[in-house]
């Protein structure tokens, strides 16, 4: 049997202003958040995943569809639960204005697709950062997903599941 889904959707629309800074930009991150509160970071979604499973254990999680639209370089996102990094995904690509990256971790359609303004669709799986967990899922309970996408617009859909039948 396939599970029933209830979709929770949230969006962040950010201004497309370019920010010019000085100083060194490091090409690595650490698996923790530097702020006292993860909600202080721009591009953070707080998610309450109320999925129900017949065998409800901590390893179960729900699929997610992430959409990133607009200009950004090497977009990536991280899922935190109780302050700990539990999943991450990212791509080595430069999104231009008019392009949209759609990444789905649904079992039936695990895809990473790039849409351009002319309607062309291409797979960007080969540009996925394979040092990350990839095709993130949201854990049961309260968690946060943090996007590092500069000024691009972001939306996330969490597919709550019910497979108790």
Regions found by a protein language model. Give the residues of each.
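Oligomerization/assembly interface segments of phage tail-like spikes and tubes
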Residues: 1-9, 143
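Intrinsically disordered, low-complexity segments enriched in serine, threonine, and glycine
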Residues: 17-165
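Short, charged, solvent-exposed linker or helix-capping segments at domain edges/interfaces
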Residues: 8-19
């Amino acid at each position: 049997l396939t599970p029933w889904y209830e979709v929770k959707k949230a969006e962040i629309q950010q201004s497309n202003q370019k920010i010019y800074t000085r100083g060194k930009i490091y090409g690595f991150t650490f698996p923790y958040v530097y702020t006292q509160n993860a909600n202080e970071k721009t591009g953070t979604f707080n998610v309450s995943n109320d999925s129900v499973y017949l065998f409800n254990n901590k390893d179960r999680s729900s699929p997610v569809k992430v959409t990133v639209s607009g200009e950004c370089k090497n977009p990536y996102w991280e899922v935190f639960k109780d302050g700990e990094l539990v999943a991450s995904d990212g791509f080595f690509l430069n999104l231009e204005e008019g392009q949209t990256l759609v990444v789905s971790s649904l079992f039936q359609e695990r895809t990473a697709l790039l849409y351009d303004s002319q309607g062309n669709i291409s797979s960007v799986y080969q540009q996925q950062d394979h040092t990350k967990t990839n095709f993130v899922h949201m854990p049961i309970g309260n968690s946060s997903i943090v996007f590092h996408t500069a000024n691009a617009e972001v939306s996330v859909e969490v597919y709550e599941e019910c497979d108790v039948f």
